[in-house]
């Protein structure tokens, strides 16, 4: 039970940004052969400002299968050489279990009572399409924003396996590296926990609407994102994310979309960059490996650009 809960919470926490894009988590069948690992790693070396050893930034994708969960050899060398490993949030079982209450309702109501019969029926319909045995019964004590995210995660959860972030955390622990989160779960999820119930209901409705639309059109934005990640090209990853953001920004609930974008990406980029800068300043003699979702390293302003602005030299490592 603890292992299942840990995996579910890890997916919920680290895939929170997927709600921003309203992605349907239903990977398409792959006809072509896949590489063993990404063609290029999303890896950057940090130097300068008195650092005695280089440290590294690494972009992950929060899935649990395929070549994306195997480190590129260059990333493996950097990871093995580091003495400290950092994920977005602490991924040890105790920290994950302690964060579970963030996902639970505190208003004394059941989910169906809050969202109404029509939306509840749509949620159940989507769950049945994922697996005929699924329904919303386990969701009734969860927050509405959690119910908006979980349908997108369940296919990965049901496949089993560990997301790359968790695999690296466990490997770091087994290797005796120091481990920590760059954020606390409560801070990472504030984008959702600060939403009003009406906003959470809109998020759920728009998520289900997006899943249905992609299915009807035969699209799979998630697979597009995975494919882009495997190429190791930040521009391709940014293009997929930017398209999803544009679609949301042009939609009916533009203000809500803009608020989520700011909280999930812009604010968190700065928060994690500040943590990295403070860590490097405090421990310049050690090699640190900072892993966060790929979306935090693409675009005009991101974690890496914040470090450059702070005076560090940040260089892409491609092989």
Task: Indicate where each model-derived feature is located.
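N-terminal secretory signal peptides that target proteins for export/translocation
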Residues: 1-7
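Bacterial N-terminal signal peptides
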Residues: 11-24
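Sec/Tat signal peptide C-region and signal peptidase I cleavage site
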Residues: 26-31
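Structured, acidic catalytic/metal-binding patches in enzyme active sites
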Residues: 34-35, 42-260
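Alpha-helical scaffolding within the catalytic cores
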Residues: 39-44, 272-274
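A cross-kingdom marker for long, charged
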Residues: 255-319
